[in-house]
Each structure stands twice: as structure tokens, then as C-alpha cells.
Amino acid sequence: MCGIVGYVGTDKSLEVLLGGLKRLEYRGYDSAGIAVIAPDGSLATAKRAGKLDVLTDELQQHPIPDGGTGIGHTRWATHGGPTDCNAHPHLGDDGRLAVIHNGIIENFATLRDELLAEEFTFESETDTEVAAVLLGREYRAAGSLSEAFQRVVSRLEGAFTLLALHQDQPHVVVGARRNSPLVIGLGEGENFLGSDVAAFVEHTQRALAIGQDQIVTITPEQVTVTDFAGAPVEVEPFDVAWDATAAEKGGWPSFMAKEIAEEPDAVANTLRGRAADGAVHIPELDALGDEFFLGIDQITIVACGTAAYAGLVGSYAIEKWARVPVTVELSHEFRYREPVISGGTLIVSISQSGETMDTLMAVKYAREAGAKAISVCNTQGATIPRESDAALYTHAGPEVAVASTKAFVGQIAALYLFGLSLARVRGTLSAAQQRDAVAELFAVPEKIRAVLESKDTIAQLAHWMSDTRSVLFLGRHVGYPIALEGALKLKELAYIHAEGFAAGELKHGPIALIEPGQPVFVVVPSPRWSDELHKKVVSNIQEIRARGARVIAIAEAGDAAVLPFADEVIRIPLAAPLFEPLLSVIPLQIFAMELAVAKGLDVDQPRNLAKSVTVE
């Protein structure tokens, strides 16, 4: 959620910090601030509530000296409102040190009372200032930033990433993480810290991901990682697979428009190198050995939001192909209901960032109960893959818009690959069936391109409906999670009421919502796959149309049965039915984006939302 940047190097810290925070805006925030060690050795800070532009305007009107060491932060409020005072950094040791923080310090009230009893004072409502004041006290006792920092983080409870600097040690930044992201960037004569690699990818693509309960100290020439007890830790470097230009708009009106246009490539890149001779072979999973998968007797997919809907789509395919029971659980509900877990349970987690706190906690809970774990993730160096037996990366590229589009189709494609790989190992599909499925799957990217060609028609529809106050979405089978995702996108981007339903539930309550003019999107299944299911959906369309609904059908090319009953029909190319979600979701994404644009809303940074939810 919060964005964090740290830098030690040459006298360009303002450039690095502000540029890094700009690339972390997608994480969601309501205030921003920086702290810099000035050339004269003093600590200079600036922070403001509001967007990053407010901070940059402040710096233009009231400049602070540049320097070679600094930390920067974008805040998503948890403790205390979005005010200048509550914005980070927070100061300690009489303004000689600065701290920034992502996460929640659960025992901050106890620590605050302890410090108040010693007559320390506080200016903000935040838990972060407690850490800053505590660090100032410990620094005075220890005389060393690293030693004081180690003492402080060992006392903190909760999930957090913490960065600090002190003017007495002007070429040092220290950081720590527990259940919250922190990545190191390795430069020449300079080093970086960030919530993710986007913070520093403009300057270096060489990175290190530190583990749980670890502390990092960076100077211009050195990076040191220890555990919370001070013992040295070896960390493996990795290379970021994309450069800074991939996280820029490149002439598009919004990141969301750009990322929707990139969906064919997102799917193609996820599939690339993972099939041979008509069968799926995923190197990351094959390395675990067949026995790992043959021992599975149930699969539980854990995820939140859009990722959970990707999991629902994937569950239909995995269960059909591999003949293993598959359930999909919301991560934040999973571990609180005492689920039945055994050594035969495989947990498949889905998280674009690999840092979603609820999903991370679900994976840890399942692992402690004896489950195996695989993660589907789009971000190198993330925490959840490191907590799993293996990671299946989607290679969708950086997704900057807060509401997910290309990561969603990448996740579905990855789950299809996993299902086909599992079926091959378990022998539940013939060689011919595997070849046919692989061929159909690898044909999807070009079919997505064909759907994108109808974007102008969909945009026109959205602009016509810009005063709509409520929209319903219906689907059956794999169309049901697409209906859920279509409704979520509209809520996220256009701030209007939208609900997704299984079409079979219509007569069990939701039909009461139908009134004249009510817009209803219907994801129509292919009649080539199940004529019975197709007829039922057409019947549902007739039922709502009879009550005055305005029906927008998403149907495959050549399906004439919907024409007499739909007000508008958006066509998608013919595809194997299980793969249709990768096509039918595209018009719904475009519609939600264009409706938000018609209302004059920010489609990249919707209100109140964060890209990566790193607190529970």
C-alpha cells in the first residue's frame, strides 16, 4: 500500500526519491514526504497531504538542499487521517533522524505509553512516530544507528517495512521488513531500497529481495543484510525482467488503456516457453518432480478481489482436466474458519504483487498445517513466492493502474497452464486432448487482439450510459466469475453500484432488481459446448427483457439465438469454451474504463484503493 524509497549515493537524492515515488503511485496513497541529508550534514524534510504533485509544488516554493542520502514515502492512512502532520517521514532524536514505514505496528499504544512515561512527546496520531521516537531513544543509548535500529525492530509487533536515516551517519540508510515488502537495488557507487523494483528500475535492474525478519544497511559502496539478531544473511541477486519504459504511459491516455492494449502480450508472455510437443511443461513446476503432484488429493486456491475471480475461472479448468477437487477461498476468510488441511492439500495462491498480506498469511497458515504451496505471481523478488514450494510467474509486465486488467488475464493463463501440466502428470488427458487444448490456448492472444478492435464501439456504448446508476452482470459456468469481475471493475473505476450474479440465481432473488431501463450485461456461453446451458442463458435474457431490462450480451461470433432478445451484442471470436473468459472479460474492462472516462474520473488511481494491499 504505502510506497517506500531509500537512496545512498551521489548528490541526486531528490531526483531518485521523487522519481521512485512517482513510479510507486500505483500502490495508492493520500500523502507524500521525503527526508534528505543535506550537504552541510543537516536533516531536511518536506511532506504534504495529497498527491505527489502537491509535494513537488511545495518543494518548488520552499526548496530543500539536495544530497546523497534520502528516504521517501507515499502514505495510505491507517493510524490518523491524511494530514500534513501524519504524513511521513517522522522524526526522532530532536529532529536528527527520520523514519518512514509501511504496515501496522500492532503494539504501538504500549510503546507510546512507555515513551510518554519517560516524558517524550508526539506530534502526530501515527504508529510510525512511535517507532521514530523509540529509535531516537535507542540511538542515544547505543551511539550506532544499526544497533539502535536492531533493538527497535525486535520490539515491534505486526507487519511492517521500516526505513531510517540519521544525520550523524550521513551515508547510511537502514531498513527492515516483517511480512511487508522491501527490495534492494544494486548500483555503481550507489544503492537503493524500495517497496518494489519500480522504485529504482530507472537506475538499476540488478536487485536483491530480503527475507522475513531481516535488516539491511546500505551505503554507497556496500549492502549488508542480517537477521533481527544481527547474524549475517546471504541474499541471492536477481535481474529485473523489464526496464523503466515498460512502466511509462508511452503516449497512451492512461496506464489502464495501455495495459488493456497489452493483454495479448501479457497472455503470450505467460505462455512462452512452457509447452513443447503439444504438452505443457513448466520448468518451475517440473523441478518439483512428479511425486509432488501425484500426492495431491485436493487443491485450494486462495486470493482476494480480481485474483480470486481468476482463481474461480481456473478452478473450472483444473478440476475438469486434472480430476482433482478444487475450491476457491478468499484469503482473508480462509484461515479463520479452521479449514481441513493435510499433506495432500495443495494451496495455490494468486497475487499480482506477491505481497497481498491476507494471501501471504493464508499461505503461511496452510504451510504450517502441512500443505504444499504454489504461487501465481507477477512480481520478481516478492514474499509469497518465497513462502511457496514453487512460483509460476505470469510475465505480464508492470501493471501500474490500480485496477487489474492484464495481470488478470495473465493469472488465468497461468492457471490453465498449471491445469494442463497437472493433467499430464496425472494422466487424466490423452495426448490428443492435450495437443488440442494447448493449440487452443496458444491461439488466444491473437483472438484478444480481435476483441480489442471493437473498443470504439464499446466506448461509444459506455459514453451513452454515462449517467447510469446501477448495472447488473450475469453469467453461467466460466462466465459467472467474469460477471463478478465485470461488476468489480465498474465499482472500482466508475464508482457506481454494480453486482455480478450466477444467471441461475436470477429467480432466487436478484430478478427483483430488474426494472425498466436497468442495464444488464450477460456473458453468453457457447452453444457449441453445451446447448442446454446456452438455452438456459437465453431464457434468462428473455426473463429480464420481459421486465424491461436493457440487455447487453457478450456472445461468440455466429450466435444468432441472442439477437431477438438483446439490445446490444458484443461479439468475441470462437474459442474453446473453457478459454472464453480470456476473451469475454475484455469488453467489460473497456466498458468500465470508458464509463469512468466519460464521468471525468481518474482510471489509474481510483479513490480509496491501493494496488498492493499489504496490511490485513
UniProtKB/Swiss-Prot annotation:
Protein name per Swiss-Prot or TrEMBL: Glutamine--fructose-6-phosphate aminotransferase [isomerizing]
Subunit (UniProt): Homodimer.
GO molecular function, one term: carbohydrate derivative binding
InterPro entries: GATase_2_dom, GFAT, GFAT_N, GlmS/AgaS_SIS, GlmS/FrlB_SIS, Ntn_hydrolases_N, SIS_dom, SIS_dom_sf
Span of domain SIS: 288-428, 461-606
Main location: cytoplasm
Keywords from the UniProt entry: Aminotransferase, Cytoplasm, Glutamine amidotransferase, Repeat, Transferase
CDD domains for this protein: GFAT, SIS_GlmS_GlmD_1, SIS_GlmS_GlmD_2
Superkingdom assignment: Bacteria
Catalytic activity of the protein: D-fructose 6-phosphate + L-glutamine = D-glucosamine 6-phosphate + L-glutamate
HAMAP family hit by this protein: GlmS
Cellular component terms per the entry's GO annotation: cytosol
Species, as recorded: Leifsonia xyli subsp. xyli (strain CTCB07)
Sequence ranges assigned to domain Glutamine amidotransferase type-2 in this UniProt record: 2-221
Key word 4Fe-4S present: no
EC number, as in UniProt: 2.6.1.16
Residues forming coiled coils: none
PANTHER family membership: GLUCOSAMINE--FRUCTOSE-6-PHOSPHATE AMINOTRANSFERASE, ISOMERIZING, GLUTAMINE--FRUCTOSE-6-PHOSPHATE TRANSAMINASE (ISOMERIZING)
Function: Catalyzes the first step in hexosamine metabolism, converting fructose-6P into glucosamine-6P using glutamine as a nitrogen source.
Entries under Pfam families matching the protein: GATase_6 (PF13522), SIS (PF01380)
